[in-house]
Amino acid sequence: MKGIFLVVQLGFSIMVFLFLAAVNWYQGSELVSDRFDWNYTAKLSKLLNGIDAVSSPKQISQLDFFIYSAKHYPVMSALMIISFLYVLAALFLLIYSVKCNKQEIHLDC
């Protein structure tokens, strides 16, 4: 019964994380229309493209959307990070639970 609860908890936390990631991605896509922030926020685009300044929206990396979202919408970004940590914790507990149950079965045989 505990294993089913952990699987449901893991599934729900993954869905919450994916939803919050989509929200952050959407909020960060505002970077394309905000030319002023290109040089201050699009750090990964500069690094990946090997350029000094971003001059076109096509040069902006998708990862920079998350940076822009964290800069302008920190609450949603913090919730996404917390939900990711919860996914990791739930996954760890599920793996630990399965491992402990297999050891108990193995010792009884």
From Swiss-Prot:
It is found in: Membrane. GO terms for cellular component: membrane. The keyword Transit peptide does not apply. Residues 1-25 form the signal peptide. It holds the Pfam family DUF4306. It is a single-pass membrane protein. This is Uncharacterized protein YjdJ.
